[in-house]
């Protein structure tokens, strides 16, 4: 009878004892979590590196000018003056449309200068030169582009055209843009037939060359006896624009 009682108790214990799980391996939950975390980290790394790649490989000229120009523009000879004649500060910008550092200056400072011009705080004399004329094949793109920029003033498209010349800047050593291509840019901005005739005639070439020689020989625009573009001058003297706050400093000095 005692054996029967023991057998009965054993059957009851087996009936209520928990059965081992057959679909879960000890520690598998922790492993699944590690896999999920690893995948998430990998995705984040891919996104970060993709963002860095896009930023580092963005062309300088791809930036668009966010501030719309509302200032007046006039031309005197081969100098384009942007802004109100009564503005308290005058800045002179010497540039070459083939010069990559000029393109960088334009990209970095276009919005700040445009805002100051719109508000009447400054006027800017733009001197488009041809010091890099020999850097295209055939030579002459710097002159052709400088002439086209002058043609853009009476056509009423100078601010936008000036920006486009840098946004579509050809590489040194290339053929550069042709007169037909420069005319097409102006036409896309609303210029009429007179603009095309002005660009193709290249009538300011000699004056641009003379202005380049005069600027290059001006000791107030040189550093260690050398002239280059871009050169930025206030009161006729070259200033350092490597500081990102240079414009605010100039405006504050009045």
Predicted regions and their residues:
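Structural alpha/beta surface segment adjacent to cysteine/selenocysteine redox centers
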Residues: 97, 103-181
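A short beta-strand-turn-helix
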Residues: 72-88
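Extracellular/periplasmic catalytic domains that process cell-envelope and extracellular macromolecules
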Residues: 85, 117-119, 223-226
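A generic local structural motif
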Residues: 76-80, 110-111, 218-219
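C-terminal cap of thioredoxin/glutaredoxin-like
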Residues: 2-39, 43, 48-49, 55-56, ...
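Short, well-ordered beta-strand elements
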Residues: 90-93
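Ser/Thr/Pro/Gly-rich low-complexity linker/stalk segments immediately outside membranes or between
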Residues: 58-73
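A broad detector of the eukaryotic-type serine/threonine protein kinase catalytic domain
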Residues: 99, 166, 170, 191-194, ...
């Amino acid at each position: 009878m005692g054996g029967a009682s023991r057998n009965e108790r054993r059957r009851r214990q087996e009936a209520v004892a928990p059965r081992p799980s057959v679909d879960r391996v000890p520690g598998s939950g922790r492993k699944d979590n590690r896999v999920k975390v690893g995948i998430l980290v990998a995705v984040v790394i891919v996104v970060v590196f993709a963002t860095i790649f896009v930023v580092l490989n963005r062309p300088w000229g791809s930036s668009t000018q966010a501030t719309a120009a509302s200032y007046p523009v006039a031309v005197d000879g081969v100098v384009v003056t942007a802004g109100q004649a009564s503005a308290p500060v005058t800045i002179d910008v010497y540039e070459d449309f083939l010069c990559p550092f000029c393109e960088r200056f334009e990209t970095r400072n276009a919005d700040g200068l445009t805002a100051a011009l719109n508000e009447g705080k400054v006027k800017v004399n733009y001197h488009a030169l041809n010091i890099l004329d020999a850097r295209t094949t055939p030579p002459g793109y710097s002159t052709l582009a400088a002439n086209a920029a002058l043609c853009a003033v009476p056509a009423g498209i100078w601010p936008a055209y000036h920006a486009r010349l840098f946004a579509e800047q050809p590489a040194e050593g290339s053929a550069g843009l042709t007169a037909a291509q420069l005319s097409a840019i102006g036409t896309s901005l609303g210029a009429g037939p007179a603009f095309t005739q002005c660009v193709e005639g290249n009538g300011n070439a000699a004056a641009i060359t003379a202005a380049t020689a005069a600027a290059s020989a001006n000791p107030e625009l040189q550093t260690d006896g050398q002239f280059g573009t871009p050169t930025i001058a206030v009161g006729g003297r070259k200033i350092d624009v490597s500081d990102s706050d240079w414009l605010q400093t100039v405006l504050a000095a009045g």
